[in-house]
């Protein structure tokens, strides 16, 4: 009986872990959330979602377990990427877990995002080159919402990522 109870508890724990990690938003849920938070779902929002999801995976973190510092540039239309990162990581200015830096992104970058795991201090840095601006603008002009999402999620070389201490 004890052995059966231990096996059942182990199975429940394993399934719970699968459910938690598989509990992701669908593309339609991302569109709806992005539009609600940002006021629309242009091509920059899924760039931020992709960065945020990638960081959570690399840092082995769950939403709300990270802090975000976003460096914007004067070349980007607005800090749209930051809103995508925010909805993917559940970081927010109100929780003091998302900051838009006073300093700008370095030359050649339209955005730099540093995402740090609160518990360990481990961090990853993402740089989106300003050479992506024409392609993102084209996606906004020529693709529907789903097309923008898919293009951003599949684009090779969309950002550079570096581990930080």
Model-derived regions: residue spans:
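Positively charged n-region of N-terminal signal peptides that target proteins for export
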Residues: 1-4
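Bacterial N-terminal signal peptides
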Residues: 7-17
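N-terminal compositionally biased, intrinsically disordered segments and leader/signal-like regions
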Residues: 6, 21-22
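Non-transmembrane, aqueous-exposed alpha-helical and coiled segments at domain scale
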Residues: 23-41, 46-165
């Amino acid at each position: 009986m004890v052995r059966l109870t231990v096996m059942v508890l182990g199975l429940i724990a394993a399934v719970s872990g699968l459910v938690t990690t598989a509990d992701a938003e669908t593309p339609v849920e991302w569109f709806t959330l992005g539009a609600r938070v940002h006021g629309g779902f242009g091509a920059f929002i899924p760039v931020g979602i992709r960065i945020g999801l990638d960081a959570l995976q690399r840092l082995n973190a769950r939403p709300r377990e990270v802090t975000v510092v976003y460096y914007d540039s004067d070349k980007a239309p607005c800090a749209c990427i930051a809103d995508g990162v925010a909805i993917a990581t559940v970081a927010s200015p109100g929780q003091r877990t998302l900051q838009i830096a006073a300093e700008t992104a370095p030359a050649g970058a339209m955005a730099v995002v540093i995402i740090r795991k609160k518990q360990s201090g481990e961090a990853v840095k993402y740089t989106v080159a300003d050479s992506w601006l024409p392609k993102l603008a084209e996606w906004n002009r020529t693709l529907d919402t789903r097309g923008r999402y898919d293009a951003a999620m599949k684009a090779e070389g969309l950002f550079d990522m570096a581990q930080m201490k």
